[in-house]
Amino acid sequence: MVVLVDTVSSTPVRPRHPEKAARPDSLSPKKPDWIRVRAPTTRGYGETRSIVKENGLVTVCEEAGCPNIGECWDKKHATFMIMGDTCTRACAFCNVKTGLPGALDPNEPAYVAEATRKLGLEHLVITSVDRDDLADGGAAHFAATIRAVREHCPTTTIEILTPDFLRKDGALDVVVAAKPDVFNHNLETVPSRYLSVRPGARYFHSIRLLQRVKELDPTIFTKSGIMVGLGEERHEVLQVMDDLRSAEVDFLTIGQYLQPTRKHHAVMRYVTPDEFGGYGKTAYAKGFLMVSASPMTRSSHHAGDDFAKLRAARAALSR
């Protein structure tokens, strides 16, 4: 690994992940042939990037280093990350900056709505950093953003990917009352890997969060996802499926974990496309309305197309 040292600037640059700086490098196996992405060089990519920057917005596509950014931005699809670019947690898999976030921007909901209009989005995905520093975890800001998009882009369907609102009483009720079309909260990994991968979260709290969404509003689609390749066993993935179905979750995503830097959790193995296919078939057999399972699957990848399929699957059940 090459380390670049700034010998010109007098202002010290804060590490993106200060809590990981002292860790030894974690080496991952070489990527197999099926892990391939297109370089982001198209005209559509450039136009999307311009709209994002003009509105002063943050995207999880950039901050998390999503491998699908070239494909999605070429189609003018972007996932907006609200409440800043700095997270209060330090998950071992995540490339988003860690630290003390700044104050919320009260104009951000309007900026998201305006960017949605300019991009012509039929389906919008909104996510956020964890904001454990806020009394409501950012729930009111989520709700305000949903309402702003509804007002300015009434035909756009809205999917949210939320933090867990751990120890934030009443926060979930505020978000659900804003009536997103899809409520996504990712489990990220199997329970046995939480201490090493997602130490600030609680597995069964996340399951209960998803279950509670259905109790508050059964019309909202619920969605969750996990990464594989973090050291989990197959039977553990199947148990996660059962736990999610017990919470009546509609949509499951499963994708390959890719290491952002050598300071992050190592890739323990690359799951083969055939194994992903097997997970997909099993998940459908367990009753999920929609499943996306492949090496390059990510929560927001093809979200608009998947939402159309999700609605069609629910409609077919009610006939």
Curated annotation (Swiss-Prot):
Listed Basic and acidic residues bias regions: 16-32
Annotated Radical SAM core domain residues: 73-289
Enzyme Commission identifier(s): 2.8.1.8
Record's catalysed reaction(s): [[Fe-S] cluster scaffold protein carrying a second [4Fe-4S](2+) cluster] + N(6)-octanoyl-L-lysyl-[protein] + 2 oxidized [2Fe-2S]-[ferredoxin] + 2 S-adenosyl-L-methionine + 4 H(+) = [[Fe-S] cluster scaffold protein] + N(6)-[(R)-dihydrolipoyl]-L-lysyl-[protein] + 4 Fe(3+) + 2 hydrogen sulfide + 2 5'-deoxyadenosine + 2 L-methionine + 2 reduced [2Fe-2S]-[ferredoxin]
UniProt keyword DNA-binding, yes or no: no
SMART domains: Elp3
Location in or out of the cell: Cytoplasm
Annotated pathway: Protein modification; protein lipoylation via endogenous pathway; protein N(6)-(lipoyl)lysine from octanoyl-[acyl-carrier-protein]: step 2/2
UniProt binding sites for [4Fe-4S] cluster 2: 87, 91, 94
First-listed, main subcellular location of the protein, grouped into a coarse class: cytoplasm
Pfam families: Radical_SAM
CDD domains: Radical_SAM
Keyword Iron-sulfur attached: yes
Cofactor field: [4Fe-4S] cluster
Gene Ontology annotations for the cellular component aspect, listed alphabetically: cytoplasm
Sequence positions that bind [4Fe-4S] cluster 1: 61, 66, 72, 300
Domain of life: Bacteria
Family the entry assigns: Belongs to the radical SAM superfamily. Lipoyl synthase family.
Protein name: Lipoyl synthase
Gene from which this protein is expressed: lipA
